[in-house]
């Protein structure tokens, strides 16, 4: 199969102004589609950009490469979400143990993307997507008393950081925790932006240290960021014409199927006889 195909994904640099054929590389077209869809999901339900994009890109490349492409769009969109609302000071006061724990957890598990267990990353990602979707579909109602927020948040943060360092996904168990402490809808949306900004910056530090952020991710990163904002704009417009809960349900069901495919294909590839 030709270079740049899904079985051997490589980012081919643009060599000159008139040479637009590199833009038509299948992997770049796949990145465009993945981030348009991920941005659309974020525009409709307010989250899901890294989860969807990493999950889709993992079909065509190792999770470490997928995360390196996702990192810049994730940081930019989360910074934007951080400052949309008046709750920033209260969010930092309540969630600093969660954010500090996430940074520590990401640092503790920094070697997962490049170490001897990196080959299991796609399997772990697949199972994590299934868990994330199942929790969302069941809509578990959990509560954490205010007096326990700090220490529970710290533990949840460490676990989230370790999972993030291995898969790039930061919603488990951080999001159920933020829902459990009783944040209102608008405050929760802004809190997700604040938390994901910190978590993504911590992950970016891991990627940079491991040498995964280099010039080969520059072009895909720019394309991904543009497509993310385009998808978000479309999703925000569509949100007024559809029921977000109905869309969210079908989105989570699709995440289960994606998780099954990723985990199943990776296990087969890892253990199938030569």
Residue ranges and their predicted role:
Residues 69-118, 201-246:
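Selective hydrophobic functional segments
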Residues 59-64, 85-92, 179-187, 210-214:
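Juxtamembrane helix-boundary/capping and inter-helix hinge elements in multi-pass membrane proteins
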Residues 90-93, 115-129, 139, 241, ...:
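Loop-to-transmembrane alpha-helix entry segments
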């Amino acid at each position: 199969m030709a270079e740049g195909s899904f079985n051997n994904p490589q980012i081919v640099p643009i060599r000159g102004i008139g040479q637009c054929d590199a833009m038509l590389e299948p992997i770049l077209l796949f990145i465009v589609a993945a981030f348009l869809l991920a941005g659309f999901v974020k525009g409709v339900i307010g989250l899901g950009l890294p989860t969807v994009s990493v999950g889709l890109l993992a079909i065509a490349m190792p999770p470490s490469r997928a995360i390196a492409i996702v990192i810049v769009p994730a940081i930019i969109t989360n910074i934007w979400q951080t400052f949309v609302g008046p709750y920033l000071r209260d969010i930092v006061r309540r969630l600093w143990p969660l954010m500090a724990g996430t940074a520590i957890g990401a640092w503790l598990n920094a070697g997962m993307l490049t170490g001897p267990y990196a080959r299991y990353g796609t399997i772990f990602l697949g199972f994590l997507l299934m868990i994330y979707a199942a929790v969302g579909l069941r809509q578990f109602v959990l509560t954490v008393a205010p007096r326990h927020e700090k220490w529970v948040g710290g533990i949840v943060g460490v676990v989230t950081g370790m999972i993030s360092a291995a898969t790039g996904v930061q919603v488990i168990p951080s999001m159920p925790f933020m829902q459990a402490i009783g944040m209102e809808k608008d405050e929760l949306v802004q809190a997700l932006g604040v938390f994901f900004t910190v978590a993504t910056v911590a992950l970016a530090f891991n990627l940079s240290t491991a040498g995964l952020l280099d010039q080969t991710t520059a072009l895909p990163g720019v394309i991904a960021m543009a497509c993310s904002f385009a998808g978000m704009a479309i999703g925000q417009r569509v949100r007024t014409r559809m029921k977000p809960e109905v869309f969210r349900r079908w989105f989570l069901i699709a995440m289960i199927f994606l998780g099954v495919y990723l985990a199943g294909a990776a296990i087969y590839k890892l253990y199938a006889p030569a």
